[in-house]
């Protein structure tokens, strides 16, 4: 492989209504489809996937505490971007099904728009369109590339752009943002999500809540989905409830079967309660 003697310095600066972000990328002669890693000028380790935009990750030293989670931003201007609900969780837990259920529950009384994240396709957005969740023009699908969690935490501009645009186009009351499926360490930045939902399911067994991770411990609401599968996989819901309450210091969680509508009304109530508190609006 040919060597490269030159350096590349990339500086991106973008500001949001909640503050400024400055990303510095410093790459020393590392090229190629497989990406690579290097130490940036900021002292953080940066990497890229398959030639995609470089990014770094905030170090995570512990699963965190519910009581010490980042609070909603005080400086938020909802006229510029409506109250945003972030929905995260591992692959296959029911994020897109929840997006569909929330759209169906809220669209009659509230102006909604949705942004979905997939790694290399627009499948989740297409699913919502196919099932008539919202008019097609109110749904945007974003391809995040190899690190979907970076798009909801370290470099949120890929999501902020379409969310702000949709919010202004449709005078949205609520925005829904679904992350790409990821691991238990992924969680939304408060600069992107005013209310954070993390969804797991029982198919991984009843050990998942106690494994923790920022999503499980620090989301505003934890959803344990597909409870109807518990007997088939030998998952004990009582154990999951105990561990969820312990890991989340009593923070709220909902047992659900989103596909069958079980628990959806309770989830909607949690969202609207947070929306009322943040915006000063009354539910309709």
UniProtKB/Swiss-Prot annotation:
SUPFAM superfamilies per UniProt: P-loop containing nucleoside triphosphate hydrolases (SSF52540)
Basic and acidic residues bias (residue ranges): 15-29, 41-51
Family, per entry: Belongs to the SIMIBI class G3E GTPase family. UreG subfamily.
Listed name of the protein: Urease accessory protein G
GO BP, one annotated term: urea catabolic process
Region annotation Disordered: where it falls in the sequence: 1-51
Molecular function terms from GO: GTP binding; GTPase activity; nickel cation binding
Originating species: Oryza sativa subsp. indica
Keyword Calcium: no
Keyword Oxidoreductase (UniProt): no
Gene3D superfamilies: P-loop containing nucleotide triphosphate hydrolases (3.40.50.300)
Keywords for the protein's UniProt record, in alphabetical order: Chaperone, GTP-binding, Nickel insertion, Nucleotide-binding
Subunit structure: URED, UREF and UREG may form a complex that acts as a GTP-hydrolysis-dependent molecular chaperone, activating the urease apoprotein.
Database matches in PANTHER family: UREASE ACCESSORY PROTEIN G (PTHR31715:SF0)
Name of the encoding gene: UREG
